[in-house]
From Swiss-Prot:
[2Fe-2S] cluster binds at C113, C144, C204, R276. PROSITE patterns: RADICAL_SAM. Residues 54-281 form the Radical SAM core domain. GO terms for molecular function: 2 iron, 2 sulfur cluster binding; 4 iron, 4 sulfur cluster binding; biotin synthase activity; iron ion binding. Homodimer. It comes from Glaesserella parasuis serovar 5 (strain SH0165) (Haemophilus parasuis). The keyword ATP-binding does not apply. Belongs to the radical SAM superfamily. Biotin synthase family. Catalyzes the conversion of dethiobiotin (DTB) to biotin by the insertion of a sulfur atom into dethiobiotin via a radical-based mechanism. This is Biotin synthase. Binds 1 [4Fe-4S] cluster. The cluster is coordinated with 3 cysteines and an exchangeable S-adenosyl-L-methionine. The gene is bioB.
Length: 335
């Protein structure tokens, strides 16, 4: 038997039984350790079984309430605990938000995502964002919100207002969560995700890589996402954007191949989820992004800003998509 045949046999043995939901961390590590070309090829094969490989879901993200967050996430420039130059801003006017949503739709976005820098919303905040959701939803866009940890009944209120997705990331490997965030726990995140799923909302849940974690810890993050039952409909994979003033401003750069591996492993372990290239894309060369799409990424944030960090300009994204013969999904084509 050839060396390549042995590799194929070994990687085929990694796949859980089709009815199994659980991925052991060691299994995910084995995927990460596959030869790069084998890993990307396998991910591309799985991607094509479930999606049109030339279709990209476009989302636009707007910060509707910026800065002053009580949390101490070491990666986040919106924390009130760090001097990052981000000015605290109150809730944006609903008419302004709707105008931004109209522009996003006209430019090809099928989903409008709204973020508010809260540890968790108060009941009056839910009333405010519910009105905003209804207004944006009336434009024919999918809606997604990221508003922090939810109390009982809040997810149901958001669902009634028309929210489609709730974003609540697991951030990093559960075993190192306390090293990155000290004001909440991994269990707190899981609690809100349970509330969101029980309310009938779709889940957008991913994490951040490049925070000085090991490959094994990246595998732990992917395993924790893949073992959510059911799996998230949308999985944003963020590359750390290092911001001066945050504890992670001097984090070691993540090798680009390791990021592509993360995308590929996310696609293999979550075959039916949309895998999104999220924060950090402005620092990714076009060839790297193309490899990510080959490895199973099929969603991007479209627009020049992600909350408070830079994102590639829309014109640049249009040119890249044309080069790669990719086309945007319309709202009617997104499940």
């Amino acid at each position: 038997m050839t060396t390549y045949s042995l590799r194929l046999k070994a990687k085929n043995e990694l796949t859980p039984h089709p009815t199994a939901q659980y991925w052991r961390k060691c299994q995910v590590e084995e995927l990460f350790d596959l030869p790069f070309m084998d890993l990307v090829f396998r991910a591309a094969e799985i991607h094509r079984q479930h999606f049109d490989p030339n279709a990209i879901q476009l989302s636009t993200l707007l910060s509707i309430k910026t800065g002053g967050c009580a949390e101490d996430c070491e990666y986040c420039p919106q924390s009130a605990r760090y001097d990052t130059g981000v000015e605290k801003q109150s809730m944006l006017d609903v008419n302004y938000i709707v105008e931004k949503a109209q522009i996003a739709k006209a430019r090809g976005a099928s989903r409008f995502c709204m973020g508010a820098a809260w540890r968790g919303p108060k009941p009056k905040d839910i009333e405010t964002v519910s009105a905003i959701i209804k207004a944006v939803k009336s434009l024919g866009l999918e809606t997604c919100g990221t508003f922090g940890m939810l109390e009982e009944g809040m997810a149901e209120d958001l669902k009634e207002a028309g929210l489609d997705y709730y974003n609540h990331n697991l951030d990093t490997d559960p075993e190192r969560y306390h090293q990155v965030i000290h004001t909440r726990s991994h269990d707190d995140r899981m609690d809100t995700l349970g509330k969101v799923r029980s309310a009938g909302l779709k889940i957008c849940c991913g994490g951040i890589v490049g925070m000085n974690e090991t490959r094994a810890e990246r595998a732990g993050l992917i395993a924790s996402l893949a073992n959510l039952d059911p799996q998230p409909e949308s999985v944003p994979i963020n590359q750390l954007v290092k911001v001066a003033g945050t504890p992670l401003e001097n984090a070691e750069d993540l090798d680009w191949t390791e990021f592509v591996r993360t995308i590929a492993v996310a696609r293999i372990t979550m075959p039916k989820s949309y895998v999104r290239l999220s924060a950090g894309r402005s620092n990714m060369p076009e060839a790297m992004q193309a490899l990510c799409f080959m490895a199973g990424a099929n969603s991007i944030f479209y627009g020049d800003k992600l909350l408070t960090t830079e994102n590639p300009e829309e014109d640049g994204d249009r040119v890249l998509m044309e080069k790669l013969n990719l086309y945007p999904l319309s709202c009617s084509n997104v499940e």
